[in-house]
């Protein structure tokens, strides 16, 4: 059982996640976004070859908090795998962009409405989404794991969830996986809009477990918030950079070319290693 000072410490860490989410959301609500990202001009010839309009700044929508892919650090900077990868690709290909911090559902809606040029938000490439969006080459292969309270010694597998409730985040692979097995293993689900509240529900004992993308939950566990992972990774989808179907082909082409270059020169792995320790 977590008590006293340890509980307060965990609560502060979860509160920090929640405040980061709220701060990012308020930026979007005020009509602002994270600072405009301008790539270096070193690869401008590549950008011209890809058919980029001179001086164009692409609007890229993202989630509010989906660590380690996008989140605000202690200095208030918006960082993460997605953010660092996009910055490096833009520098490699010589294009400019501006981040719109909207939340996942709102980011997708903004893209569909033509208010954004693309989405990068740990977005799984699925057949259903491919009917609506064109995706880049996969930039990350994900998967789903189950997390429980750190001092819980009773739950070790899906079989131990029978008769219990499980917390999931709306629109994630974790929620889809939970729905696919809950009839077999006899548990119910409660949905949350963000990871921090989902984690709090497990830590407080309202839910017995949560299902989450493994790099996201793995990063949260590394922050000592009071959770642990008890299952092996279930194979999941790959993440991709998305544009509306038939639109912004030049941006998609630059993303793919830049991604290939980063994988070749080692920068891609360097970015992953910054946030994920295997």
Q: Which residues fall in each region the model found?
A:
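Periplasmic-binding protein-like
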Residues: 64, 140-148, 218-260, 278
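Extracytoplasmic small-molecule ligand-binding "clamshell" domains
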Residues: 46, 50-122
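Ligand-binding clefts/hinges and TM-proximal coupling segments of bilobed small-molecule sensing domains
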Residues: 32-33, 49-50, 98, 173-193, ...
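Short, low-complexity, disordered segments immediately C-terminal to signal peptides
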Residues: 31-54
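A ligand-binding cleft/hinge motif common to bilobed small-molecule-binding domains
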Residues: 123-132, 177-180, 201-235
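C-terminal motif of bacterial Sec signal peptides marking the signal peptidase cleavage site
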Residues: 25-29
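Flexible hinge/capping segments at coil-to-helix
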Residues: 149-166
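Short helix-initiation/N-cap motifs at beta->coil->alpha
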Residues: 83, 98-110, 153, 189-204, ...
């Amino acid at each position: 059982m977590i008590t006293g000072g340890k509980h307060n410490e965990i609560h502060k860490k979860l509160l920090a996640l929640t405040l980061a989410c709220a701060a990012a959301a308020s930026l979007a609500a005020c009509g602002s976004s994270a600072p405009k990202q301008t790539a270096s001009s070193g690869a401008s010839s590549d950008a011209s070859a890809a058919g980029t309009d001179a001086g164009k700044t692409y609007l890229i929508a993202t989630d509010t908090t989906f660590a380690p892919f996008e989140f605000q650090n202690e200095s208030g900077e918006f960082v993460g795998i997605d953010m660092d990868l996009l910055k490096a690709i833009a520098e490699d290909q010589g294009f400019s962009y501006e981040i719109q911090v909207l939340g996942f559902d709102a980011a997708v809606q903004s893209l569909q409405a033509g208010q954004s040029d693309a989405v990068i938000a740990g977005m799984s490439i699925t057949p259903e989404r491919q009917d609506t969006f064109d995706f880049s080459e996969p930039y990350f292969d994900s998967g789903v794991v189950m997390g429980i309270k750190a001092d819980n010694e009773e739950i070790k597998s899906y079989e131990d969830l029978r008769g219990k409730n499980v917390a999931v985040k709306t629109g994630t692979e974790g929620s889809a996986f939970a729905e696919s097995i809950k009839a077999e293993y006899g548990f119910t689900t409660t949905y949350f809009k963000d990871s921090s509240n989902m984690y709090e529900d497990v830590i407080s004992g309202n839910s017995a477990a949560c299902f989450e993308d493994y790099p996201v939950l793995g990063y949260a566990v590394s922050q000592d918030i009071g959770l642990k992972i008890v299952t092996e990774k279930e194979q999941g989808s790959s993440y991709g950079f998305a544009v509306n179907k038939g639109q912004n082909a030049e941006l998609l082409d630059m993303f793919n070319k830049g991604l290939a270059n980063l994988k070749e020169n080692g920068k891609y792995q360097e970015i992953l290693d910054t946030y994920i320790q295997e």
